[in-house]
């Protein structure tokens, strides 16, 4: 396996109007005079480790040069501010990027092994609930998108934004809570089992919101109504195992096209309870699938493991707990299956694994 070695000198942390912030409680990474490479080496074997780094950026900022810099920084996941898959509305809100740039950024990031998350913002100016639902439907029906994770941030009005004036002038009117909750229920029903909804509301104090939903328990209300109607969200967050949950887990495979390449979503799931214990995202890059040279030579000819994650409560390194999903061999079995698929089905001679610095030991 190849843990995405860096061949260039470490870059400084700062990315064209995008802030690279590493939030951690690890003193090993907070030493003021430590060079990035030295801090990364220390973190590989530290008692407390940073095992992944996520950054947020705009789709139009993503190019091959930027991606190389993200690799140097140890980034493992990139969140794109997609907002809505509708060029008319993106132009209206002066977003200054297009859906074509969202698709291009997604393909570059996937082919470099990153996990990809989207931010969607229902209730933007010019949008209707039907527009928002169509955007969510396209998100997973169109293979040019299909993100791994999703954050839903319904639009609200704050005084510091230009939208505040639009609202005062009557040019913008947010959805009422009833409309918003029903829209979110419909959106959650569209999300496939390989994707994860991480957020359903943004943490903005209700005292700062002039218009729009001020409900801090929006996700809970959506889930309550879905349960009352016998509906279930099948996103990963709603299905992942909780502390101490028993289960009989079997290896499950889902294949789908994405960004010009092929994805195999491998997982250990309990069919009876629809719980998920462990997952692996394996990718045949678009370059390899279409017999083109990879623009990143270190990944030439390799299938990519973009994520390996076991859920449940944390178990220490080299430890085991009978009531936990971690350290039961699920991850090892998924890696072995990924190697088999890459070698026997896709004709790849090697696998490259993107891993957080603290997960490489």
Model-derived features: where do they sit?
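Conserved non-cysteine loop/helix-boundary elements of the Radical SAM core domain that shape
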Residues: 1-5, 33-117, 121-178, 182, ...
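Short, basic, low-complexity termini and linkers enriched in Ser/Thr/Gly/Pro
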Residues: 10-34
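Conserved beta-strand positions in the central sheet of alpha/beta enzyme cores
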Residues: 79, 151, 304-306, 352
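C-terminal accessory regions of radical SAM enzymes
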Residues: 171-289
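Conserved acetyl-CoA binding element of GNAT-fold acetyltransferases
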Residues: 299-326
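Conserved acetyl-CoA-binding loop-helix of GNAT-fold acetyltransferases
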Residues: 321-342
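Conserved GNAT acetyl-CoA-binding A-motif
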Residues: 340-355
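Conserved active-site alpha-helix within GNAT-family acetyltransferase domains
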Residues: 357-361
